[in-house]
Amino acid sequence: MAAAMMNKSVLLNKQCGKPAAVPKVVMSKGGFARTSAVNKNRDMMVWQPFNNKMFETFSFLPPLTDEQISKQVDYILANSWTPCLEFAASDQAYAGNENCIRMGPVASTYQDNRYWTMWKLPMFGCTDGSQVLSEIQACTNAFPDAYIRLVCFDANRQVQISGFLVHRPPSATDYRLPADRQV
């Protein structure tokens, strides 16, 4: 039956005009079909639930370089979004029972109940990426042991569009390489 289903998927893919890489079906001794792709250990790993904290956009990546941050700032400004810097001490950066404001029966991990301190004012009308980068540097110099993130807002939709870390404290041990995030 599995082979018949595989043949149908090949036919459907041929009708679409796109060649499809269909995994080879292997029958085990117990009569169960398995694909060869499942044999890879990496495909079946379990997410590490402890000390695997992440922030917003790009938090699954290694810390961004200055050049990568500059490209993101250019993208933000090209879309006419308003950049804004926020910072938080290490013990206040993650959502938790100690640092969340609760309004009703809301879980402590709900992101909107956790606020970071704003660095100056949002950069309304900013058109030069170097201004944003110099503010990131000034905030980093003022608070070297804090998490600093860049968020951007769309005035038309009146929502936050993106947010990502631009600085982690040197003492931070929360970042894990992608290979270390799984058991």
Swiss-Prot record:
GO molecular function, one term: ribulose-bisphosphate carboxylase activity
Domain of life: Eukaryota
Annotated organelle transit peptide span: 1-42
Main location: plastid
UniProt record, GO biological process: photorespiration; reductive pentose-phosphate cycle
InterPro entries registered for this protein in UniProt: RuBisCO_ssu, RuBisCO_ssu_dom, RuBisCO_ssu_sf
GO cellular component, one term: chloroplast
CDD domains registered for this protein in UniProt: RuBisCO_small
Pfam families: RuBisCO_small
Compartments where found: Plastid, Chloroplast
Keyword Kinase attributed: no
Gene3D superfamilies: Ribulose bisphosphate carboxylase, small subunit
SMART domains found in the cross-reference section: RuBisCO_small
Keyword set, alphabetical order: Calvin cycle, Carbon dioxide fixation, Chloroplast, Photorespiration, Photosynthesis, Plastid, Transit peptide
SUPFAM superfamilies tied to this protein: RuBisCO, small subunit
Subunit composition and interactions: Heterohexadecamer of 8 large and 8 small subunits.
Additional remarks: The basic functional RuBisCO is composed of a large chain homodimer in a 'head-to-tail' conformation. In form I RuBisCO this homodimer is arranged in a barrel-like tetramer with the small subunits forming a tetrameric 'cap' on each end of the 'barrel'.
Reported function: RuBisCO catalyzes two reactions: the carboxylation of D-ribulose 1,5-bisphosphate, the primary event in carbon dioxide fixation, as well as the oxidative fragmentation of the pentose substrate. Both reactions occur simultaneously and in competition at the same active site. Although the small subunit is not catalytic it is essential for maximal activity.
Family label: Belongs to the RuBisCO small chain family.
PANTHER family from the UniProt entry: RIBULOSE BISPHOSPHATE CARBOXYLASE SMALL CHAIN 1, CHLOROPLASTIC (PTHR31262), RIBULOSE BISPHOSPHATE CARBOXYLASE SMALL SUBUNIT, CHLOROPLASTIC 1 (PTHR31262:SF0)
Protein name: Ribulose bisphosphate carboxylase small subunit, chloroplastic 5
Organism in which the protein naturally occurs: Acetabularia acetabulum (Mermaid's wine glass)
Gene that encodes it: RBCS5
